[in-house]
């Protein structure tokens, strides 16, 4: 039974990681307010290495629709500006000396729908990842029964427990998706 408990615990931990990754992906998509996490995934070239933007500059919220990026080194201004422009966020930074202001455009209905579509894709990818984790766990359990290390009753109970874990995590994904869709469609 210890092996089965370990398999269930492993499945739950892996599904938690998928859920956390989804939460981070959702945090990057902001509809109605500026937030520093919007630029978290942007990397810049710094002395030949790609590093996250927040390691070469201070990112702060100036107001509800503007982010301010202040590089720690003057020569990083054009590099950071280009990285923000070429990101898939559709932002146009404005540079004033060593300060880069990133105004967030007011979202059109079309852009909101596009963001909802992206959010749904992220949620579906998380669901698929969780189903794959369930499949891997069930496969491991089937291997144990082939090796006669557990009984068929143990197998059935373990598979039911893993299914409950999966259902719980997929329900959480659906709840996060509903909240995010509502957030994105608010004007």
Curated annotation (Swiss-Prot):
**A GO molecular-function descriptor:** ribosomal large subunit binding
Domain of life of the native organism: Bacteria
Where, per UniProt, does this protein localize? Cytoplasm
Q: Which InterPro entries match?
A: Ribosome_recyc_fac (IPR002661), Ribosome_recyc_fac_dom (IPR023584), RRF_sf (IPR036191)
Q: Name its GO BP terms in alphabetical order.
A: cytoplasmic translational termination
UniProt GO cellular component terms: cytosol
Q: Any keyword Translocase?
A: no
The UniProt keywords, alphabetically, are: Cytoplasm, Protein biosynthesis
CDD domains, alphabetized: RRF
Family note: Belongs to the RRF family.
Q: What does this protein do?
A: Responsible for the release of ribosomes from messenger RNA at the termination of protein biosynthesis. May increase the efficiency of translation by recycling ribosomes from one round of translation to another.
This chain belongs to the protein called: Ribosome-recycling factor
Q: Which classification does the entry list for the species? A: Bacteria, Pseudomonadati, Pseudomonadota, Gammaproteobacteria, Chromatiales
Q: Which gene encodes it?
A: frr
